[in-house]
């Protein structure tokens, strides 16, 4: 039996493509590429990164351990990765007009955890928006670490219009005296009055944290109000509207607080940072500093308004009556359709969305009465108002078909709409 020499094996290790070494995984990746190319991505938390971001994240920096911070590493050989992290930090500070940035958190959830570790002790009271009202798991939801380790108090939205209930927030803050107040969420589509929340935080002696994961790109472009002048600390993901790699980041104008946060991220919560991801963050932040990024964010927000208006014209309700950002929460009850059924039917028509509870939702969390939609990914590939009017009509057509179906069989409508979706996507190709 002929055996390859060790040198030949080493050469293959460094040069053989994935399709040759692991065809099953290569096929799965190819399938996902096809889904992204041939479908309309409407999940509000997803976007499409540039070739440059992909290149940085897939670079040799994945091989390098770099515990610590630039100039203060616990490993040698960090000169190049120090440059990458320093670029990411400098660009983040310029982008958001802040004095401090930590770009090492692996995710938005870990960025939030690092802030908790820096500012809180187990059992402290925190006040955040409830998940049912549009908040995030990490803001005190019962199943999450934030709801288990802390005395989590939750504020919500007003029943009459779905907007943030500032009076409830202020009342709970005065009654419960939280150590930390959190603003921001995962399914809240309106501007937030950060100055008003900071005022009550100061009144009760609380830290004020804003999780701007969803609207960070809009903040960077000056389209959504910036929380940076008002919050003690701001967290974000680096994907979503910011259009970078999946990761997290923490910002502040308080340098003393920044020292606590640095210690909380490393060595408190994480070990080695993901230097290939940090390099990709630097690329994305550089892209966001260019004039075309502001134009993209402006288009993203305008497209969201057009999509919401088209859905209303089609007989659907939008929670809060519209949107100030990239996302909207669609109430499906006028069509007598569940979020679970809508998500599945839309996906069969090559449109990806996610079922989502609406405020005061009577349906179970696994079923829901709504879907959440967003415009970041389709705007990235070039969709404008005309295309989003088409998308809105496609969605209404699928939901009307689902509503009219007694047995849930919407195959004919899904096929007809799916063909139109494929035709539209072919006009706006990605990763050719």
UniProtKB/Swiss-Prot annotation:
Protein name from the UniProt record: Serine hydroxymethyltransferase
Organism: Acidiphilium cryptum (strain JF-5)
GO biological-process terms attached to the record: glycine biosynthetic process from serine; tetrahydrofolate interconversion
Catalytic activity: (6R)-5,10-methylene-5,6,7,8-tetrahydrofolate + glycine + H2O = (6S)-5,6,7,8-tetrahydrofolate + L-serine
Subcellular location, principal: cytoplasm
Enzyme Commission designation: 2.1.2.1
Site (Plays an important role in substrate specificity): 239
SUPFAM superfamilies membership: PLP-dependent transferases (SSF53383)
GO molecular-function terms, A-Z: glycine hydroxymethyltransferase activity; pyridoxal phosphate binding
Location in or out of the cell: Cytoplasm
């Amino acid at each position: 039996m002929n055996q390859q020499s060790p040198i030949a094996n080493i050469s293959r290790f460094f040069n053989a493509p994935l399709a040759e070494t692991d065809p099953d995984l290569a096929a799965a990746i190819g399938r996902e590429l096809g889904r992204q190319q041939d479908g309309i991505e409407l999940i509000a938390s997803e976007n499409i990164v540039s070739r440059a971001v992909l290149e940085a994240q897939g670079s040799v920096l994945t091989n390098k351990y770099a515990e610590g911070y630039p100039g203060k590493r616990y490993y040698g050989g960090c000169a190049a990765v120090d440059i990458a992290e320093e670029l990411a930090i400098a660009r983040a500070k310029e982008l958001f007009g802040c004095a401090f940035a930590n770009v090492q958190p692996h995710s938005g959830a870990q960025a939030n955890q690092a802030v908790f570790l820096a500012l809180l002790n187990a059992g402290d009271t925190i006040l955040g928006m409830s998940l049912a009202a549009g908040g995030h798991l990490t803001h005190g939801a019962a199943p999450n670490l934030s709801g288990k380790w802390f005395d989590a108090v939750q504020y919500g939205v007003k029943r009459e219009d779905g907007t943030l209930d500032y009076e409830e927030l202020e009342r709970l803050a005065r009654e419960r005296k939280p150590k930390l107040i959190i603003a921001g969420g995962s399914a809240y589509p309106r501007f937030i009055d950060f100055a008003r929340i900071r005022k009550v935080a100061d009144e009760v002696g609380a830290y004020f944290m804003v999780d701007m994961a969803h609207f960070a790109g809009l903040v960077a472009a000056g389209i959504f109000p910036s929380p940076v002048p008002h919050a003690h600390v701001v967290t974000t993901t680096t994907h979503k509207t910011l259009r970078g790699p999946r990761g997290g980041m923490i910002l502040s104008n308080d340098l003393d607080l920044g020292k606590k946060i640095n210690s909380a991220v490393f060595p408190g919560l994480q070990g080695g940072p993901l230097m290939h991801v940090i390099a990709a963050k630097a690329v994305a932040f550089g892209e966001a500093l260019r004039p075309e990024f502001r134009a993209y964010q402006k288009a993203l927000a305008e497209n969201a308004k057009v999509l919401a208006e088209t859905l209303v014209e089609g007989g659907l309700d939008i929670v809060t009556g519209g949107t100030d950002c990239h996302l909207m929460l669609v109430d499906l009850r006028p069509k007598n359709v569940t979020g679970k059924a809508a998500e599945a039917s839309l996906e069969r028509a090559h449109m990806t969305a996610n079922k989502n509870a609406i405020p005061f939702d009577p349906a179970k969390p696994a079923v829901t009465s709504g879907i959440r939609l967003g415009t970041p990914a389709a705007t990235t590939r070039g969709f404008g108002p005309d295309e989003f009017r088409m998308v809105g009509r496609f969605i209404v057509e699928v939901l009307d078909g689902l509503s009219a179906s007694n047995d849930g069989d919407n195959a004919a409508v899904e096929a007809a709409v799916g063909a139109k979706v494929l035709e539209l996507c072919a006009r706006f190709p990605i990763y050719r």
